[in-house]
Structure formats: structure tokens, C-alpha cells
Amino acid sequence: IHETISFYIGNDPNLKIKWPNDILINDAKISGALIENIIGGENKYTIIGIGINILSSPKLDIYQTAFINEFLNTPINVKHVFLKLKVNLENKLKDFSTKTVNIIRHQMLNNAWKINENVNYISNSIESSGLFENISENYEIIIRTETNQVKLSSGELKLIRD
């Protein structure tokens, strides 16, 4: 998703991945993804929903939003963005090897929102804070607190915006 948006607005250093599933530009949400894993018997499915603000974005009180066309001189077509996203996803998924997983993790680290900064987060309904140090090989966020290092998966954590 980050790669697709970068294709249109360029390699803006303010385009960040808010772990685990949002894309922000200038701290405003431009995209998000929802992932649902369904396991039943021998059947295993993953459903991914992706939203990218292209033509406009909702006005929200809880955080700022952005859309691709506000960064462009010439508006782009929604279908064009969809096709570019489709190609990018297909390219990542067709070679889903250890090498590809490491490349994706490296891209996440290079573009992570608040990496090497103190973050506020909620885990098990408890708000805490710590230094966002890293993302593990299993895509867990690694946070250094005053007393220890914590690894949390996306289902256990919510990063809080300032």
C-alpha cells in the first residue's frame, strides 16, 4: 500500500506506516487495511480490506485525514490506483519467500511512523508508553519500557496518536 501511494506522490519522507495497518502522511491518515483470518477445519482464509483515500477523505474529530489527489497537480483516476495496487500486491504475493518477507520488513522499518520515538500504546486495556525500537521478524512491534522490552502482535496493541 505504501509503495502504491509513493508511486503517485513520490518518495515523501513524511509518508509513514503506522504499525500495523495504517499509512499516514504528515501524521494524517491516507490509507488503512483490515485483516481477518478465518480458520475452520482444513480451510484457512485471510480476507484483506484496503482503503485508500484518493479523491477525498473524511473529516474526523479524532485525527486528521488526507487523500492522494491533494498532493498532485493533475488528479488521478481511482481505477488506475486500484490496478497499480493490484500489481504491487501480486508481485509481493507471487514470491512470498523468506527473502520477500525480509524485504517487506525492511521497508516497514525504513518507513515506520514513530520508530525510535516514545509512543503511547494500549495493550490488554492498559495504556502504557515506551520507545518504539524495532519490528521483529514475526512483525511484532518491539517497545522498550522503563523495566523491560515488550513484543506485541497487532491484536494485542493499539498505538495512540498524540
Positions of the model-derived regions?
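Conserved active-site carboxylates
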Residues: D22
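Long, positively charged amphipathic alpha-helical accessory segments at protein N-termini or as interdomain linkers
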Residues: I1-N14, I25-D162
